[in-house]
Amino acid sequence: MPKFYCDYCDTYLTHDSPSVRKTHCSGRKHKENVKDYYQKWMEEQAQSLIDKTTAAFQQGKIPPTPFPGAPPPGGSLLPHPSIGGPPRPGMLPAPPMGGPPMMPMMGPPPHAMMPGGPGPGMRPPMGGPMQMMPGPHMMRPPARPMMPAVRPGMVRPDR
């Protein structure tokens, strides 16, 4: 009778039957071995990706990513209009702090776009306040209570 070999545990089981395999596979030691195997596999995959990316970068296939705040290549960095000083000719004035930008000749934004929440179709910033998502806890109760199905000839408990 052939024996069952477990690659994760590097061991042979006493005999090849579904009940022995099921018992072995539900054991603590087997589960730890499986977890360790896939953990090592993921680490190898990540290291392989890092090595490939590093090699491509060193060969010049991947351009260096500019750091935030670094001047763009071949140009000078102009100060942002909101960093003090009067607006330059041809530029709109800086938006008020804490509010959305206003377009010229349009007046203030509608109430839905006031500070304190994102406007319609906009997401809150990363790390900002989380909005509640509708879910089972926010659903309305049924319009009428659900009654058990009654077969013809059976007596309903409420009558």
UniProtKB/Swiss-Prot annotation:
Biased composition (Pro residues): 63-74, 84-99
Organism superkingdom: Eukaryota
SMART domains the record matches: ZnF_U1
Gene Ontology molecular function, alphabetical: mRNA binding; pre-mRNA 5'-splice site binding; U1 snRNA binding; zinc ion binding
Chief localization: nucleus
Region Disordered: start-end pairs: 61-99
Protein name: U1 small nuclear ribonucleoprotein C
